[in-house]
Amino acid sequence: MSNDHLETTGSSDPNTNLLKYLPIVLNPDRTITRPIQIPSTAASPDPTSSSPVLTKDLALNPLHNTFVRLFLPRHALYNSAKLPLVVYFHGGGFILFSAASTIFHDFCCEMAVHAGVVIASVDYRLAPEHRLPAAYDDAMEALQWIKDSRDEWLTNFADFSNCFIMGESAGGNIAYHAGLRAAAVADELLPLKIKGLVLDEPGFGGSKRTGSELRLANDSRLPTFVLDLIWELSLPMGADRDHEYCNPTAESEPLYSFDKIRSLGWRVMVVGCHGDPMIDRQMELAERLEKKGVDVVAQFDVGGYHAVKLEDPEKAKQFFVILKKFVVDSCTTKL
């Protein structure tokens, strides 16, 4: 996407309009500056605190400055039964936020309590400094790290035989691609046994506009030019939006086949809303998975907007009910 495209939004300075949607400045060389410090929350592992969820950070790859933030519901300390494990990837268009960002920290705390799960939220490398597939590589490294971890929270309270890969927005894209990769090497991840994927408003795109993208081209949160820029900054240099990282339905078969997910018996939950410009692509992916024989649970709500659950507590609670049922049903399914 060119600077001229950005200027069509009504200003000679493309960043004037861009800052309305993303806290970044686009530099002439197509790098970005993040001028605003996004609120973050420190981990709190103290069991004597009043918090219903304990949290702590563990280094994943010091060379990449990546880490995993664990979320442990306090009630797990007093129960003998282990809880399902959710490996979570935050959103942010591949270019913003971290596992410590307050908006995702708070969401994971609520999810841990209401869904009754242990969460390992992965802090992955961001684009454009680290373009895709860097985040996918970090995701796989996290799964391997969890498999081999001797951390007492994971070994004592997380049920490795009931693991789920989940992500929101760009994180949903990461969860999808990490899931395809993990399915291809499932035996190597044992005793970590994945039961399903949770794709929460997963971020996908394509060169040809869908009906929802056209209908919501001037969306107040994710207008077309912002989505295009996110992909320009995140995809490998020279790739277009029909690259498999962006458009999972562009080719007849992905690099890592759906067939393995089906044969492993994994279930896939796809969640979205019709106020999201990417809803058509999310629905198309769910349909394609179903046609491949994958057990899909799809929930597409009327109205709403992208990332509504991060801002609306009632929407979040409704989602946690659906998520908990998906997790419980998946855990009782024999693979």
Swiss-Prot record:
Q: How is its activity regulated?
A: Is inhibited by the organophosphates paraoxon and dimethylchlorophosphate (DMCP).
Q: Does Hydrolase appear among the keywords?
A: yes
An example molecular function term from Gene Ontology annotations: carboxylesterase activity
Q: Which Pfam families match?
A: Abhydrolase_3
Tell me its EC number(s), please.
3.1.1.1
Q: Where is the signal peptide?
A: none
- Annotated catalytic residues: 169, 276, 306
The entry's family comment says: Belongs to the 'GDXG' lipolytic enzyme family.
What is the protein named? Carboxylesterase 1
Q: Which gene encodes it?
A: CXE1
